[in-house]
Amino acid sequence: MKTLLLTLVVVTIVCLDFGHTLICYNYWTPLDKTTECCGNGVTTCFAKSWNDHRGRRTDRGCGCPNVKPGIHLNCCKTDRCNG
């Protein structure tokens, strides 16, 4: 619990600026919830998912990338909306 709190404090300090910086999840598994501060001008977070030989895979991050057919993409515009 202390580690989670410390992580949130560090992310908050890093993301503090005089404008608004979007915060998006960038973790690969539900057990590893990490975030990133998006660059200036980035206004969306994404979550894309697909199936491969290892099962269901999900990738998250800043922006809204183009994806190939067969990949499900969800883009959103609020902090941590891609969880």
Curated annotation (Swiss-Prot):
Entry GO terms, CC: extracellular region
The keyword Disulfide bond belongs to this UniProt entry's keyword annotation: yes
Subcellular location: Secreted
One annotated GO molecular function: acetylcholine receptor inhibitor activity
Leader peptide range in chain numbering: 1-21
Keywords from the named record: Acetylcholine receptor inhibiting toxin, Disulfide bond, Ion channel impairing toxin, Neurotoxin, Postsynaptic neurotoxin, Secreted, Signal, Toxin
PROSITE patterns: SNAKE_TOXIN
InterPro entries, alphabetized: Snake_3FTx, Snake_toxin-like_sf, Snake_toxin_con_site, Toxin_cobra-type
Tissue: Expressed by the venom gland.
Disulfide bonds: 24-45, 38-62, 64-75, 76-81
Primary localisation category: secreted
Subunit structure: Dimer.
Family: Belongs to the three-finger toxin family. Short-chain subfamily. Type I alpha-neurotoxin sub-subfamily.
Role description: Binds to muscle nicotinic acetylcholine receptor (nAChR) and inhibit acetylcholine from binding to the receptor, thereby impairing neuromuscular transmission.
Protein name in the entry: Three finger toxin MALT0054C
